[in-house]
Amino acid sequence: MGRDCLNLMRIQLLTTGISALLAASSVSVSLAQQTVTDQYGTEILLDVLPPTTQMKVEETRSVLDSGGGEGPLKVDKLGRFHIDHGAGKGVGGSSGDDEFLVNQLLGIVLLPRPGDVRPDGWPGVEGIWHDFENFPRQVGLVLQSYIGKPVSLGSLDQLVKDVIVAYREGDRPVVDVLIPEQDITSGVVQLVVIESELARIRVEGVDANTEEFIRNQMRVKKGEVIRASEVLRDLSWVNRSPYRKVDMVYAPGYEFGTTDVILKSYQTRANWFYTGYEDSGVDYLGEDRFIVGFNMGDAFGPNRSLSYQFTSDLDFEHVRSNSLVYTQSLPWRHWFTVLASYVDIDSDPIPVGGGNSLDSDGDNIQLSGRYSIPLDGTANRQREMDFGFDWKSNGNNLEFVDFSNLNNTQLFGSRVEIFQFSLGYNETIQHQRGVSQFDIRGIWSPGGFNNHNSDAAFESSRAGSTADYFYFVGSFEHQRRLHDDWSMRFKVQGQDANGNLQASEQLGAGGYDTVRGFDQRVARGDHGAWGTFELYTPDLSLARIGDWENETDSLRFLGFFDAANLGNEDLLPLEPSNYQIGSVGVGLRWNYSDWFKFRLDYGYPVFTENVVTDESGRFHIGATATF
């Protein structure tokens, strides 16, 4: 027994250090100056690493910052350090680690407290024995894999590591696993597993009111065992606001077996004004657009925002658009959004033949509501579903169509009112080198709410359309970092309907946000799809090139290919069955400091079918200044 006890006393020292190191790991990017990311993507407090490893990390960072080559530790392109977690602890460092202590492991006993350990051993146990509630299945599988195998210092050391990892996979992110002094000659090993309890929640980087708000969003309480799924759900909820980014790291508490949760908040500016320009208009309303607006992200308290935007042509004559959006979280962690808009339209004279022309005026009004419900996800996967209702009162279709491609749509006629309901689902997945977004929703209109929501009113605006309809809309977008800081973006959006739709509900293509090189919404359809592929160069900096003092900027060039194929449901005589457009082009994106953004694209049409357009292509310009 003496030799075994002496050896296992050594194991106790080793495994305590290993468990403390892994217990300090975080599940999210955290305090950059105090942590290091290992090759497995785990964020570890630098202070818990062995002093020699800490020195290697600091030396490697210094070499990388100076651009002097490689340091003593290997670092991959994601900035992850290849760390030997056993370094400095003697793990596997001597041939004695592989010497068998017993020839066969018969049983493993898991205990919650060191005081429960029997120093004289626990003979007679076969297999796995424990008295834990909600015992993770992953841990049981790991322990079972060691039963029946020889026991050495090295295998016990690896057992502790594997158990800690299994606990993390089983929703226990912070545990201490110890092998105290004991007699193992019976073939039974006792492990002390201490599931860490919360000591306190520390919030950094915000004022007192926001600190209290963020802390109250974390449902785990002092003295409770930490569950990764619950903590991650709470963190995801806190980060639902676009004006706040909160990162988390676990740190050892003052008492043994406890853990502090540190929340580091990076507040972004929530209240601002902005103005801008873009050439996104349509025929007879002018292509130029002047934009001004404001956003109040926390004026009414956390998780309440109000935004307003005014858009018009440069002469303030043809289009005057007002839109207002209010968003608020609810106590039961759902979201409610209200959107209201009013567009006043007064066009240039429109030729109607015989040398005559006609002025088209009218207004379009919309009031919409969305009720959003976050669904269970993971650290890198957020899911949400929403219910919605739209009321639209359209008195002029010039806002939605290209005059040269009217097809069977009337510019004006009797007023049409739309009452429709929607059900949607969206998902965002964070990958190691990118992000993917998926959205699908169904829209249904029963029709018959009033005289303007009748088949007759719909027919007068769009031949073959009825007030009762149903259509699906789906989109997928993927952005990815490539080699040497190149990146790519791919997006596709599609739609299908059971009949002819009003112009405001059709899928449009053409313009800076769909198919470049064509005018805005030059093609429309009840069904079809459009897609874009973009390839971006690495960042350039005009500030560095021009040696501008105290200024930062980012300039990227891109090449793209855009295409669309659209069609209508119930065709009129001689109406084409589909409309196709496609283009290639180049562009740039320039962000100056944190207040000015500029985009420029030139698209050249490479194919068109049943669409009237300028085949020489066109530029698309947009700029926004924020104050």
Feature-to-residue mapping (PLM):
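N-terminal secretory signal peptides that target proteins for export/translocation
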Residues: 1-11
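A composition/secondary-structure signal for short, hydrophobic, low-basic-content segments
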Residues: 8, 29-30
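Bacterial N-terminal signal peptides
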Residues: 12-26
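Immediate N-terminus of the mature polypeptide
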Residues: 2, 18, 31-531, 535-627
